[in-house]
A protein has these predicted regions:
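Class II aminoacyl-tRNA synthetase catalytic cores and aaRS-like
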Residues: 1-210
Length: 210
């Protein structure tokens, strides 16, 4: 869950310094209809406010190509004010709350990603990767490895049916007690992946042997 929220993927490239933030609760008190009642993610990009209009248009085009309906953003000006399509929907109090919460600084750009819960993290992850590529933020001479653990055992498909997320033969954490008493989508499996620079090198699991 942490990897999906922070990086938008379970195969994160940790050379990319950009982090995804969950802004759903923040926007629950903002009167902006496209975000109302839906999960919202944000990505802060330092020293990006000076990019050209054409650069932002290319990012919007990329967002549309991957299935998004748009790509909102605000930039932080020298006087501390915000500029961008969403700025007018934020009260002075909400602007200050956002600044404090994300430690926004002059020349930062904050991108907003909003969609349904099943795909919003994936979309945010693709935007994060594209920003890293376009801004040349990824150190190609580095190897960053990580273990991804605590995979959810089940998820629901578009029809609400329970399906396995990965290996159905893995042991659930909590074993039979978890299967009998926990909400299925909250059960975690004894599974892991080894990831390097966004590539899965290997995976493993404790088999359901008892």
């Amino acid at each position: 869950a942490e990897s999906m929220l922070k990086y938008g993927t379970d195969k994160p490239d940790l050379r990319n310094p950009l982090i995804i933030h969950d802004l759903t609760e923040y926007f629950s008190t903002v009167e902006f209809k496209p975000f109302k009642g839906r999960p919202v993610r944000g990505i802060v990009v330092p020293n990006c406010a000076g990019q050209s209009k054409g650069w932002y248009e290319k990012m919007l085009a990329f967002a549309m190509d991957i299935g998004m309906k748009g790509l909102g953003y605000i930039t932080v000006q020298e006087d501390g004010s915000y500029k961008g399509p969403i700025d007018k929907f934020l009260s002075p109090e909400k602007k200050e709350e956002l600044r404090t919460m994300l430690d926004l600084k002059t020349d930062d750009t904050l991108f907003f990603i909003c969609d349904n819960i099943r795909i919003v993290n994936d979309l945010a992850g693709q935007i994060r990767t594209e920003l890293g590529r376009r801004l040349d933020l990824i150190d190609k001479d580095r190897f960053d490895l990580c273990f991804i653990t605590d995979f959810p055992m089940f998820e629901r498909d578009d029809d609400g049916k329970l399906i396995f997320t990965h290996n159905p033969f893995s042991m659930p954490q909590g074993e039979m007690d978890a299967l009998l008493h926990q909400e299925p989508t909250e059960i975690k499996a004894y599974q892991y992946d080894i990831v390097c620079n966004g590539v899965e090198l290997s995976s493993g699991a404790v088999r359901n042997h008892r």
